[in-house]
Amino acid sequence: GNWVPPVRDRAPDTDSCPNAQRPSEAMSTSERLAPGQPTPTPPPQVYDGPCGVIVPPGYAVPSDVYASAWAVFDADSGEVLAMKDPHGRYRPASIIKVLLALVVINELPLDQQVPVSEASANQEGSRAGIGAGGTYTVNDLLHGLLMASGNDTAHALAQAIGGDDAALRKVNALAQDLGMRDTYVASYSGLDAPGMSTSAWDLSLAYRAAFQNQTFAGIVDTDSYEFPGFDDLPGFQ
């Protein structure tokens, strides 16, 4: 069966910077290299400061925060107010979808029609529920990506910007443009893949840029969305 992480009752001690270069060893086979595939080289280390809790005087970290790494930042000014292991490298899972969303928003008209393949509709992991053979607007697919964390919508959007390889090149280029020096995106949907890495600091950069984008901010502020159906597949909310 799938590996299930243990329940924590305290935050891990990161004072010794255990994740300074790369995430901890994978606990499943999801990052197993294909035959002949080289081991990815981690991004160069750019931070040599402390890796524990870094807070201003008088700041009390809530007792129920058990994350290995986190950052509290002002989305308007970009100022980081408090943090823990800010440049420690971790697997981002689906929160890395923010980069794909920004690339798509910057590149495609929201009303562009995108056909959906069997490969898109049948992606593993979380799915919004789009149907193979259907056609959806970029706006529809972005809502499925950001509201339902759809790996199916992520795959469909990636094909619309040139395919998997092009999408990975573009999201990694955007990460570098944003100054995300701890980040390597090996999977634009957040599924585990060899070399996948980001940090709390980098994600603060990505989400600050995202919330300054009116289209992104509007989508994630949506309470509900009517997803269209087609043929015998009904629409859904």
Can you say where each PLM-predicted feature lies in the sequence?
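Short, glycine-anchored, charge-dense loop/turn motifs used at functional sites
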Residues: 70-81, 100
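Extracytoplasmic/secreted proteins, especially bacterial periplasmic and envelope-associated proteins
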Residues: 94, 99, 103, 137-144, ...
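Conserved catalytic neighborhood of penicillin-recognizing serine enzymes
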Residues: 123-159, 234-237
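Penicillin-recognizing serine hydrolase domain
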Residues: 1-65, 166-237
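Short, glycine/proline-biased beta-turn/loop segments that scaffold the active-site neighborhood
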Residues: 109-133, 221-231
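N-terminal post-signal-peptidase region of extra-cytosolic proteins
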Residues: 83-95, 126-127
